[in-house]
């Protein structure tokens, strides 16, 4: 079935996008972002007024996906409007006209994992490059970090909590850093926009320097032996056995890890939030986390999680909402597995 990506240039299409966000974010995922309007059954916020909104339509004209792009030069006060994202850090190097922020990437379930995502990024990336954008900022839940890293995005700062969304990982893409796009085997390299402008500003080198402290491991971007060396021992050292790995030899375990990525976390990062609809499975590779839960108006510490410990398994296996907070106590590295792992 053929798809097309359109720029939403009428109030009707923009309102259809707001409604699609509500269907996916509230009705499907069970989230409750502050911008949700439950009477109109749509999600619209202050960034939409000046944003480029992209719509993916099937051959019948039905809306199946969307993405939003904001140029910081179009925002009245980007530092305030995009708080708590680290906008001030970017503005120290880049003029507002060279920075974009992409958000509200959503696809209906039937269209995930197919051509729709690639078409959205192709159009958005091309428009951004043509407009003079040098870096794009986004934020992703842990289970989507792997996807963005394969596109060429890099982690560059600690994770953060967003109201109504939960723990998010800010990520940056240097649009003209062809060396990193090539190293990431990014599909963006196939697009003409990636070849039109040289990185004469040295954005790739700057990105590499600030991203080094937050570099994790993505099984698709490193040699298999390097990835296994980082995660294999921890999978067998913890007191809590991972049922999905029970009885498997090393070769079989490696096959099952083909959706894994390793995330570096800082103290006080809230990896899992009580009541949040998340479906990732986490394995502690390094460091310590603490499990907290609200009970009768009091906050109780339930457990400490150390190397080899597993958390998030109930959400991973289908429970709709997380039953407790999991907060990093020390610097950590955690292996994240998504449901594609199954």
Residue ranges and their predicted role:
Residues 13, 208-267, 316:
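Cyclic nucleotide-binding regulatory module and flanking cytosolic helices
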Residues 55, 61-71, 315:
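Conserved beta-strand in the GNAT
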Residues 261-276, 305-307:
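Conserved short histidine dyad/triad with adjacent acidic residue
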Residues 268, 279-292, 307-308:
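Glycine- and acidic-residue-biased ligand/ion/polar-headgroup-sensing regions
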Residues 301-342:
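Cyclic-nucleotide recognition modules
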């Amino acid at each position: 079935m053929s798809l097309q990506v359109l720029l939403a240039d009428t109030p009707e299409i923009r309102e259809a996008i707001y409604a699609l966000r509500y269907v996916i974010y509230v009705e499907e995922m069970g989230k409750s972002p502050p911008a949700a309007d439950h009477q109109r059954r749509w999600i619209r916020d202050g960034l939409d007024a000046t944003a480029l909104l992209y719509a993916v339509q099937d051959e019948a004209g039905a809306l199946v996906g969307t993405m939003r792009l904001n140029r910081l030069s179009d925002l009245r006060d980007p530092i305030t409007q995009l708080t708590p994202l680290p906008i001030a850090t970017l503005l120290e190097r880049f003029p507002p006209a060279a920075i974009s922020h992409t958000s509200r990437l959503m696809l209906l379930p039937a269209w995930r994992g197919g051509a729709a995502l690639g078409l959205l990024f192709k159009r958005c990336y091309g428009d951004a490059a043509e407009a003079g954008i040098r870096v794009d900022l986004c934020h992703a839940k842990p289970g989507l970090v792997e996807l963005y890293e394969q596109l060429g995005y890099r982690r560059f700062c600690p994770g953060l909590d967003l109201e109504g969304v939960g723990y998010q990982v800010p990520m940056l893409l240097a649009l003209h850093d062809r060396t990193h796009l090539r190293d990431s085997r990014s599909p963006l390299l196939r697009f003409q926009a990636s070849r039109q402008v040289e990185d004469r500003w040295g954005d790739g080198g700057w990105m590499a320097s600030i991203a080094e402290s937050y570099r994790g491991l993505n099984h698709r971007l490193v040699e298999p032996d390097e990835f296994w060396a980082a995660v294999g021992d921890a999978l067998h050292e913890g007191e809590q056995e991972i049922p999905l790995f029970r009885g498997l030899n090393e070769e079989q375990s490696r096959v099952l890890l083909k959706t894994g990525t390793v995330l570096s976390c800082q103290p006080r990062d809230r990896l899992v939030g009580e009541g949040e609809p998340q479906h990732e499975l986490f394995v502690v590779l390094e460091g310590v986390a603490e499990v907290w839960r609200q009970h009768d108006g009091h906050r109780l510490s339930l457990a400490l999680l150390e190397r080899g410990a597993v958390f998030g398994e109930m959400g991973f296996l289908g429970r709709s909402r997380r039953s407790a907070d999991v907060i990093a106590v020390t610097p950590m590295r955690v292996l994240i597995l998504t449901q594609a792992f199954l």
